[in-house]
Design a protein with these regions (language model features):
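Condensing-enzyme catalytic core mediating Claisen C-C bond formation in acyl metabolism
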Residues: 5-9, 36-37, 214-298
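Flexible, low-complexity linker/loop segments at domain and module junctions
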Residues: 1-8, 95-98, 291-293, 326, ...
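Glycine-/small-residue-rich "gating" segment that lines the acyl/pantetheine channel
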Residues: 124-131, 172, 176, 180, ...
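Acyl-CoA/ACP chain-elongation machinery
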Residues: 182-228, 261-275, 301-310, 327-377
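Active-site-proximal alpha-helical scaffold in enzymes
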Residues: 78-91, 140-143, 148-192, 230-252, ...
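ACP-dependent fatty acid/polyketide chain-elongation machinery
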Residues: 1-67, 245-257, 350-364, 407-411
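Conserved beta-ketoacyl condensing-enzyme motif
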Residues: 8, 23-25, 29-162, 191-200, ...
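A glycine- and small-aliphatic-rich helix-loop capping segment at beta-alpha/alpha-beta transitions
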Residues: 22-29, 113-127, 177-180, 200-213, ...
Length: 411
């Protein structure tokens, strides 16, 4: 089968250190953390009191008040990012082409905020007082459906839920659908709004969150000897993918090209990654083969700041690239914004596209005392200008759901 080329023509992002692509990108290049004491609710009863919480985000800048009230916060991020990406792409819709435009998103948790509110309300007020829009508001597919309804997109519409790999998975599947000719355009990415009391209690019980409450901006420290867990974040990353000739014909801005995608399962444990990194290595090898490459110029790592993940990913990178691994810059976006679960891989895809555009690698911050077992070039502390043609982005979700994406300079 003839595989069509797929390019990125629009971006949108909301993250703890910036809403809007240029604001977010500037913060990343400056190594600016968005992690702070949580105030979405009172965290005093929890051992963890910090998060990558987005502040100053106004949903009414992107949707009507009626819509904003009817949807959960994770959908707010999706609608906002969709508007940003579509504005940048200058996509013109007609009744003839809407059936060739898809919406494929990722979310690991869906409408958790509204779900928690309604569970509490139901037990307080009784089961006959349940909000009538509870089901569509909580459902993970609400984000894709709300975007399709708003813009009239009538192609494939779905949400993929593979925990921390959800956003990357969605981008990969959107890439495939365009590549194989099922659609011409797809709005894709990942969104998450996990900052709820239940989620905090659950993740605290798992003992995977950093307890560095006294120094929030230093809490997320991938590959550092003193890392003690990840910091939960929220947000969304959105990309408009388009078949290359379709984009060229309408004079769209071509920001990068998606050239490789692979996914697999580690079949090892619901939370712990395969410690030798074999399955993470296997998915990277498959993505490289899909792109027809043997190496890349930069790796945006999954790099959650947990002992197990950072070590396994380092081993996997070395297994794939051998001695060359020590010459490939690797950095962690999560060091600045925390781990936004299903949105993480999509936000990092935005970072990869911006890195290719500006030929610069954002840093890993808080890498003060490198772990001897994590001995690659993690671009510590300061952004680094670099010649970038191909970049790799890794996303590894709970349940050993592994995804690798490759983005290349637009040609």
């Amino acid at each position: 089968m003839n595989r069509r080329r797929v390019v990125v023509t629009g971006l949108g992002v909301a993250a703890a250190n910036g809403v809007g692509v240029e604001t977010f990108w500037r913060a990343n290049l400056e190594g600016r953390s968005g992690i702070s004491r949580l105030d979405a609710f009172n965290p005093d009863e929890f051992a963890v009191k910090i998060a990558g919480q987005i502040r100053g985000f106004d949903p009414l800048a992107y949707m009507t008040e009626d819509v904003a009230k009817r949807v959960d916060r994770f959908v707010h991020f999706g609608l906002a990012g969709a508007q940003m990406a579509l504005t940048q792409s200058r996509l013109n819709l007609t009744p003839e082409n809407v059936e060739r435009v898809g919406v494929i998103f990722g979310s690991g948790l869906g409408g958790q905020l509204f779900h928690e509110e309604q569970i509490l309300s139901t037990f307080e007020r009784g089961f006959m007082r349940t909000n009538p829009i509870s089901v569509p508001r909580v459902s993970p597919n609400a984000v894709a459906s709300q975007i399709a309804i708003r813009y009239g997109f009538k192609g494939p519409n779905m949400v993929i839920s593979t925990a921390c790999a959800s956003g990357a998975h969605a981008i990969g599947e959107a890439f495939r659908k365009i590549q194989y000719g099922e659609i011409d355009v797809c709005l894709t990415g990942g969104v998450e709004a996990p900052l709820t009391r239940f989620n905090f209690s659950a993740y605290c019980a798992m003992r995977v969150l950093s307890k560095n409450n006294d120094n929030p901006t230093a809490a997320s420290r991938p590959f550092d000897r003193d890392r003690d867990g990840f910091v939960m974040g929220e947000g969304g990353g959105i990309l408009l993918l388009e078949e290359r000739d379709h984009a060229l014909a309408r004079g769209a801005p071509i920001l990068s090209e998606v050239t490789g995608y692979a996914c697999n399962s580690g079949a090892h444990h619901m939370v712990i990654p395969d410690p030798d990194g074999a399955d993470a290595a296997r998915v990277m090898v498959a993505a490289l083969a899909d792109a027809g490459l043997s190496r890349v110029d930069y790796i945006n790592a999954h790099a959650t700041s947990t002992k197990a993940n950072d070590y396994a990913e380092t081993k996997a990178i070395k297994a794939v690239f051998g001695a060359a691994a020590y010459r490939i810059p690797v950095s962690s976006t999560k060091s600045m914004i925390g781990h936004s679960i299903g949105a993480a891989g999509a936000i990092e895809a935005v970072v990869c596209t911006q890195a290719l555009r500006d030929q610069i690698i954002p840093p890993t911050i808080n890498l003060d005392q490198p772990d001897p077992e994590c001995d690659l070039d993690y671009v510590p502390g300061k952004a680094r200008p670099s010649r970038l043609q191909h970049v790799l982005s890794n996303s590894f979700g709970f349940g050993n759901c592994n995804v690798s994406l490759i983005f290349s300079q637009a040609t």
